[in-house]
Amino acid sequence: MTIWIILGIVVVLIIAVIGMYNSLVQSKIKVDNAWSQIDVQLQRRFDLIPNFVETVKGYMTHEKETFEKIASLRTSWANANSVSEKAELDNQLSTTLKTIMAVSENYPELKANQNFSELSEELRNTENKISFSRQFYNDTVTMYNTKLQVFPSNIIAGMFNFKARDLFKAE
């Protein structure tokens, strides 16, 4: 009789460990998926930028330094691997694009340019998608990181080497 009780407890513990492990794996996959959604939108924005810069360059001749910074950020972003690196570069690029948009107010002929208007609208839409994706990613990471820290899943997370993820911080 005692052997059956011990065996029952062991089976319940094994099932609990498997359940917690699977829950952690599912959460990790959700985090990876949420990151890929941000990555897609960031790539879309980086793909729009060369056309935007070419459109603006002819009008904003005094902004050469800004355009060089954008080119440098694009190169750095292509080589960035971690979430924190990409978040930092994204923040710098967002600030630079806001500067260009603000300066464009001083160029009425640029604002009247159809290509500029269309690209500006596409960039704004992409920025909104990035913002939404960032929020979803951070929510998903928060849930995942919470699972890594609460008992008893923290024990399973430690046993199977699950690591906390960084939030995508915007400035």
Regions found by a protein language model. Give the residues of each.
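A helix-centric hydrophobic-segment signal that preferentially recognizes long
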Residues: 1-171
